[in-house]
Regions:
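Histidine/acidic-residue-rich, glycine-tolerant segments that coordinate divalent metal ions
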Residues: 80, 88-98, 105, 122-227
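A ubiquitous structural signal for well-ordered alpha-helices
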Residues: 18, 113, 213-216
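Acidic/His- and Gly-rich active-site-bordering loop/insert found
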Residues: 2-99, 108, 115-124
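Residue-level detector of alpha-helical segments with a strong bias toward transmembrane helices
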Residues: 112-113, 202
């Protein structure tokens, strides 16, 4: 069996170089034309077939040809409308845009993982999808990839990768259940009963109920959920 640590060290400069290249060329959500094209170039070099999904999403497939689990790795690829002030050699070349949330690293990480796993495809079983998500910062892209993977038969496990400044280089953190913030919408309807201002006892204010709900949710966030 191959030594994953040795391979990670072998391709360390490859991943760093890609990350810096992506950092120099940030693109906003759903506009990741150069980024997705660059990702496809790397997948072509590796001989990994891929599909463009709903625009600038890219999903590559490493198929070992042997029965086994199906795994997906996902990294997002969009940047933010933020001016970069850092004076580094790989500073953003597009004024007003930068990879301020690490998506340059995520794209490079998934490509690095793809290269290692593809190198050892003959030693593995099952299928591995490498997914590059557009538009994460505005809440798009993921659903299209999920639906595409369902059409292909689904996956047994999916790993959404994200860097963490509190972890040393070379370390990963895994946790059961949610570990980072998500982008979703939900709605609560509180129904009250109107009345005259002089007889609040005959009314039922939805505002009082909503404030109680809000305070309970805020308390849960502060005391029950690890930041």
């Amino acid at each position: 069996m191959f030594n994953i640590h040795e391979d990670a060290k072998k391709y360390e400069e490859y991943v760093i170089g890609l990350r810096q290249e992506f950092h120099r060329h940030p693109e906003l959500s759903d506009q990741e034309v150069w980024t997705s094209g660059r990702i496809c170039e790397e997948l072509d070099k590796m001989g990994i077939p891929y599909t463009r999904v709903a625009g600038t999403n890219v999903v590559g497939l490493i198929d070992t040809g042997r029965p086994g689990k199906t795994i997906a790795f996902r990294g997002d690829i969009d940047a933010l409308p933020v001016h970069e002030e850092a004076n580094v050699p790989f500073k953003s070349e597009i004024d007003g845009l930068m990879h301020a949330c690490g998506h340059d690293s995520h794209a490079a990480m998934v490509l690095g993982a793809a290269r290692i796993l593809n190198d050892h495809k003959d030693e593995l079983s099952g299928k591995i999808y490498v997914c590059f998500q557009k538009g994460e910062e505005v809440g798009i892209g993921a659903r299209d990839i999920v639906e595409y993977l369902k059409e292909q038969g689904g996956v047994d496990k999916a790993f959404g990768l994200h860097i963490a400044a509190n972890l040393p280089t070379g370390f990963i953190s895994l946790t059961a259940g949610p570990s980072m913030a998500g982008d979703c919408n939900w709605q609560v309807v509180v129904k009250g009963k109107g009345g005259h201002g002089s007889r609040p006892d005959q009314a039922n204010s939805p505002i009082d109920c909503f404030v109680a709900i809000y305070n309970a949710l805020e308390a849960a966030r502060l005391t029950k959920i690890t930041p």
